[in-house]
Amino acid sequence: MDYLPLFAELKQRPVLVIGGGEIAERKIKFLLRAQAQVQVVAETLSPALADLAARQALSWRATEFSDSLVDDVFLVIAATEDDALNQRVFAAANARYRLVNVVDNQALCSFVFPSIVDRSPLLVAISSSGKAPVLSRILREKIEALLPTNLGRLAESASYWRNHLKTRLTTTEARRRFWERVFTGRFASLMVAGNSAEAEKALQDELDKPERETGEIILVGAGPGDAGLLTLRGLQAIQQADVVFHDHLVTQPVLELVRRDAELICVGKRAGEHSVPQHETNQLLVEAAKAGKTVVRLKGGDPFIFGRGAEELQAAAEAGIPFQVVPGVTAAAGATAYAGIPLTHRDYAQSAVFVTGHYKPDSAPFDWSLLAKSQQTLAIYMGTMKAAEISAQLIAHGRDSDTPVAVISRGTRDDQQTITGTLQQLEHLAKDAPMPALLVVGEVVQLHQQLAWFQHTSSAEGFNASVVNLA
């Protein structure tokens, strides 16, 4: 992050602007909207600035710039076409630890002006850190179109009701949940439509409803890795959470989307490492919900596909805890799509089968004859440690040893790796593949070379290192 976004209160604070032309005019208009005490240093003023000076909306010094003018101001803006003067202003401000902006010269700026969407008191600021101003402007225009013009009334009303709410709703969590209901319900739609009286009545009705004592559990699929694959409903859920229990498969970019003051607790499991037993995870979820919290159980991929999500919701149901399920993009769909491997294709596969290689020792064995059929794609989760057995059994039950296979590691992530070969090479391919990894068996794998779009690839012949750098 090149710049820290800040909102500065400039009301009655002195701001020095060097320059009196059109460049300065644009900045001064924003400063006056923020009620700053604008001091202009320029030999002449544009007609618009001269009018503002005549109306005493700003003060004007028709003198040359001197370093001492920077001593008693809050911000400094150089808005001239004189490069030497701009350099002097920057040096003087920097030496006195004043924030300074030299218009259209990022190297001489300790702060930059963002593009602004003004729904006061609600403000949205967009910045490209000076890299792409046009992109910032385009984003601002899109956000302008999305946000209703009356949106600021919601914030004004919230400010009015805040102190009153503290006497009715005594905990921070209760107040937050109240505002989440209000801002997504009838009150918000009425206020945005301009019907303030009915909106206030709707808010009072919501306040008179009894606060629930029990929270809820929302089981959310985080997708296979790429934060862009998190569903909109999933994003809404993690933005509402009081506490998020997540596993190791949830990537950091997804976790960064969680509400900032939500508690994050890792309950993941990894082979060979200490992990939280499933029954303890179930208990943690139930206890948090019984405390009145909105609990999100965030799982990589889809929570109902080899994710043990159903077991956790069974515990919730037995405890009488309300719950929801937000599906996610499962690894077999996401990783193969990013690797350019379609799960089905009219010429190669009329079905796709998902199986797990991490099965319970006392469970019934696979129907290998069914799994070994041709004209189908086999996607195997958590199968790298059983790759030798999987390969041997499939070949023994009739699958051609030259059937194309792929091992997709860290699917949909920036460091995704796709290694291809044949079924008889599967053990070798999977041996040192980075985790998590998905095994894919089927003729559709041969389309990878033609359809791969996200990352480079490696073949069995070139795979002789513990980690293949495919970037």
UniProtKB/Swiss-Prot annotation:
Record bears the keyword Transcription: no
Region named Uroporphyrinogen-III C-methyltransferase: 215-471
Pathway assignment: Cofactor biosynthesis; adenosylcobalamin biosynthesis; precorrin-2 from uroporphyrinogen III: step 1/1; Cofactor biosynthesis; adenosylcobalamin biosynthesis; sirohydrochlorin from precorrin-2: step 1/1; Porphyrin-containing compound metabolism; siroheme biosynthesis; precorrin-2 from uroporphyrinogen III: step 1/1; Porphyrin-containing compound metabolism; siroheme biosynthesis; siroheme from sirohydrochlorin: step 1/1
Task: Specify which residues bind S-adenosyl-L-methionine according to the UniProt entry for this protein.
Answer: P224, G300, G301, D302, I305, T330, A331, M382, G411
Give the Enzyme Commission number.
Answer: 2.1.1.107, 1.3.1.76, 4.99.1.4
Q: What keywords are annotated for this sequence in UniProt?
A: Cobalamin biosynthesis, Lyase, Methyltransferase, Multifunctional enzyme, NAD, Oxidoreductase, Phosphoprotein, Porphyrin biosynthesis, S-adenosyl-L-methionine, Transferase
Q: Which terms in the Gene Ontology molecular function aspect does this entry carry?
A: NAD binding; precorrin-2 dehydrogenase activity; sirohydrochlorin ferrochelatase activity; uroporphyrin-III C-methyltransferase activity
Spell out the protein name for this chain: Siroheme synthase 1
